[in-house]
Each structure stands twice: as C-alpha cells, then as structure tokens.
C-alpha cells in the first residue's frame, strides 16, 4: 500500500509514516466513523466571535496546511477502501442527511480558511465527496482569500460544492467603528463582493 493520491508519484518517507499511522488508527474505529461522517473540519476556532453563534468559539484559529490535508485524506481513502470501492469514500452510508456531503465547519468560519480550495478539490477528486460551505464572509481587501474563493466558484471546483451559505452578521465585535476599515459600510461592500464571486454557483444551482 503506497498511500499515494491520484496526483502524486512519490511521497517522502515521513509522509508515508504519517499516512500509515493515520490509516492504522482509522481502521481500528467502527466503520461508521467514515461511512456516516458529517463534520470534517480542517480548521478550528474563529476570529469573528459573532454574537449569534451558539458554539462559543475562541477568537483564535488553527488549521491544517496542504500537506496535512493530503496526509489525512490519503489515510481516509485507503481506510475506506476496506469497506467500499464505490464513491463517495466518505459519508457513503449517511442516507438520512445529504449522502456524500461533508460539512467543514462547526466552531469555525470555513470561509476564512486559506486552504479551502485544496480541501474541497482533494475531497472531491480523491474521496468523491462534495463540500458545503458556510461563512459570515471575508474582507474584499484580502487578496489571498478573494483569489481562492474565485477559484472555488469557477468551473474548476463549482461541481464540488454542495451548498454555499452566507450568514448576515457584522462580524461580531470587530465591525463597530464606522470610521475604520471594519465599519458596517465596509461590511456591506464585502457582502456584495462575496455574492459577486459566488454568482456563477447561484446561477447554476439556485
């Protein structure tokens, strides 16, 4: 078992070791761990601290980089092949709620995750799952996030999306001063920017 993903020809010895250890752990768990998984988070915590959120997340965030995403998805893929050879290779037995769809958020805002495009792409190409995203938005001045979301909403990944939800909130505590770059007026422009970026998705799927 080489633990390679479809776009990989080789991996380092350390990556192989990590993937093997994850695989060995996953196959000791009940098959429901994979077959009925719903929340699959590459990020925890949230900078926004919105007052309406019921999760009481802390105002800091940690997340997986692309290497970690690859290692975990590889281990999931090869573990799932012990139970099924048909896609999706995750959440394939969750018939009561959106079979084959993963939710990468619970106590976090996935819209601010800087590797979301890689997470969605690898989940779709390697596991055959679609991803639903939910966010309160992001600054239109953040070039990295804007380019990433434009890529997600383009023809490259649009079929890998299972829903795009925008929660209307003034980013909790940070959007308060009307004279700053985090004013409510700025937030309105950010919402407009978000809807413009994801217009291709809404046009295609409603």
Place the predicted regions along the sequence by residue.
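N-terminal [4Fe-4S]-dependent radical SAM core
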Residues: 1-40, 57
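Residue-level signal for functionally critical sites in structured catalytic/ligand-binding pockets
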Residues: 3-4, 16, 29, 75, ...
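Short amphipathic alpha-helical segments, especially helix-boundary/capping motifs
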Residues: 14-15, 26, 50, 94-96
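N-terminal uDENN/longin-like adaptor modules and analogous extended polar/low-complexity scaffolding regions
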Residues: 22, 26, 46-49, 72-76, ...
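Core AdoMet radical
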Residues: 37, 54-70, 79-119, 123-144, ...
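Local cysteine-cluster metal-coordination motifs and their immediate loop/turn environment
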Residues: 45-57
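Catalytic cores of alpha/beta
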Residues: 146-150
């Amino acid at each position: 078992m080489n633990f390679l993903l479809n776009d990989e020809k080789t991996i380092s010895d350390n990556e192989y070791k990590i993937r093997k250890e994850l695989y060995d752990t996953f196959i000791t768990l009940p098959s429901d761990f994979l077959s009925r998984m719903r929340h699959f988070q590459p990020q925890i915590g949230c900078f926004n601290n919105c007052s309406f959120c019921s999760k009481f997340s802390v105002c800091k965030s940690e997340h997986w980089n692309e290497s970690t995403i690859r290692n975990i998805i590889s281990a999931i893929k090869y573990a799932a092949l012990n139970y099924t050879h048909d896609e999706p290779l995750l959440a394939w037995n969750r018939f009561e709620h959106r079979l084959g769809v993963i939710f990468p958020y619970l106590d976090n805002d996935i819209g601010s995750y800087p590797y979301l495009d890689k997470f969605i792409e690898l989940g779709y190409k390697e596991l055959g799952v679609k991803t639903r995203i939910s966010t309160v938005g992001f600054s239109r001045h953040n070039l990295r996030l804007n380019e990433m979301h434009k890529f997600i909403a383009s023809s490259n990944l649009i079929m890998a999306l299972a829903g795009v939800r925008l929660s209307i909130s003034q980013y909790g505590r940070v959007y308060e001063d009307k004279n700053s770059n985090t004013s409510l007026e700025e937030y309105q422009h950010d919402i407009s920017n978000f809807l413009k970026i994801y217009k291709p998705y809404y046009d295609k799927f409603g």
